[in-house]
Amino acid sequence: MADTTRKSGSRRLARERIAVLFARAAEFYPESPDRSNRCVELARKIGMRHRIRIERPLKRRFCRRCYTYLVPGSNARVRVHRGRVVVTCLACGHRSRFPVGRPRQ
């Protein structure tokens, strides 16, 4: 019984920490992109350690191949093509495609 409350409490704390790290990544990016990439790396590791998913809006802020924090216009190109938003990471060239239009059911 105590393990389940401890586990849920640590997961809640991990979610908060991940949100703080992504906020810090956005804050650090103009001065130090390497530091913001490190924040993304730490957030991913916390999520894996506690087996929690990173929320969709946060997940779309970094490249899935090189784990670079993405800022449109700076190190990411954003285009709309055939009903999808295509985000290209300018560090590694990886393209992420996200559907636009109908909401998910």
Swiss-Prot record:
Cofactor: Zn(2+)
GO biological process terms held by the UniProt record: tRNA 5'-leader removal
GO cellular component terms listed in the entry, alphabetical order: cytoplasm; ribonuclease P complex
Molecular function as annotated in GO: ribonuclease P activity; zinc ion binding
Residues that bind Zn(2+): 63, 66, 89, 92
UniProt keyword terms in alphabetical order: Cytoplasm, Endonuclease, Hydrolase, Metal-binding, Nuclease, tRNA processing, Zinc
Major enzyme class: hydrolase
Domain of life (superkingdom): Archaea
UniProt remark on cofactor binding: Binds 1 zinc ion per subunit.
PANTHER family linked to this entry: RIBONUCLEASE P PROTEIN SUBUNIT P21, RIBONUCLEASE P SUBUNIT P21
Name of the protein this chain belongs to: Ribonuclease P protein component 4
Gene, per the UniProt record: rnp4
